[in-house]
Structures are given as C-alpha cells and as structure tokens.
Amino acid sequence: MSYVVILPRSVQKQLAKLDAAALGRIEDTLLELQEKPRPSGAKKLKGRDGWRIRVGDYRVIYEIHDRVLQVIVIQIGHRRDVYRDS
C-alpha cells in the first residue's frame, strides 16, 4: 500500500530555498513517507493537526489521509521557524 505525497506550491518554494545537502535528506524522507507515513521518530503535533518528522535541523510537517492514501506536506523549514504562525 503506497501513499501519494503531495507538495503544494508553497512547500515547493520552501524546498527551493534549501541548500543541496538538506534538500537531498528531505527528498529521501519524502520518498520514505510514501511507504511508511508514520515512521519511527514521527510525532503527532499538539495543538494543531498533522505530524512532524525531524530531518537534521529541519522539520517536515504533514497530514495523513488514510482513506485516500495521501500524505499532504504542509510545511518544511528550519526547526527555529517551522512552528511559528505565519
């Protein structure tokens, strides 16, 4: 059972701002989310919908929709910025 990982335009812009090393690690993580949307280390967020996974100093915030087998990435950013309201 493989999930579809959806990257909205806003997330694609966030990815474009990352350095090559961080981008490579995050891309690997996104590929892993296709097979296992709740990998070890992923945590349910408190106070808002979604999950988060650590990728070095970066965080990937996403929602899981099991009925339609989708993982929608909400935000990708540095750990100091990603939890702040925009």
Residue ranges of predicted features:
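Enriched for short, Lys/Arg-rich terminal
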Residues: 1-6, 10-24, 55, 63-86
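A short, surface-exposed loop/turn module that caps and links secondary-structure elements
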Residues: 28-54
